[in-house]
Amino acid sequence: TPLSADDCEVPFYKDIHLSAGNGFSDDIEDYNGYKLRFSKSTLRRHGINPADVVCVCADGDSMEPVFPDGATLGINTADKVIKDGKIYAVNHGGLLRTKILQKLPDNKIRIKSYNSEAYPDEEADADEINIIGRVFWWSVIV
């Protein structure tokens, strides 16, 4: 289907493999050519540049019940400054993780999951975590 003037297509990294690096393009090695569509005006209304959006699949149950394993996540790769309680995609020790982040004293970060019974809070030095971007959207088929 042709794109309307208000539509944009963003990369959908369905199968990803992380490598060591400092930014999303360095962290993600596999791009399969898939794309998802978003409304440009909706993204702009929320302060998101369409060129900064990528989508990935959630892996695991640590963020249930908010989003389950396999949910599709929209990430704003330009939004890397931690706002306490927001959800971010991060490269932590070579693992792509989707977690709630909270700033702590002494350059530490608390890493939280919604499924906190199975995944207790963690702490890490800020320099151990590469923030890929803030999760601004997700889609789930129930």
Could you describe each region identified by the protein language model?
Residues 50-55, 83-88, 110:
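Short, hydrophobic/aromatic-rich segments at coil-to-beta transitions
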Residues 71-72, 86:
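Structural motif
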Residues 85-97, 103-107:
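Short, compositionally biased
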Residues 113-142:
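Amphipathic alpha-helical interface segments
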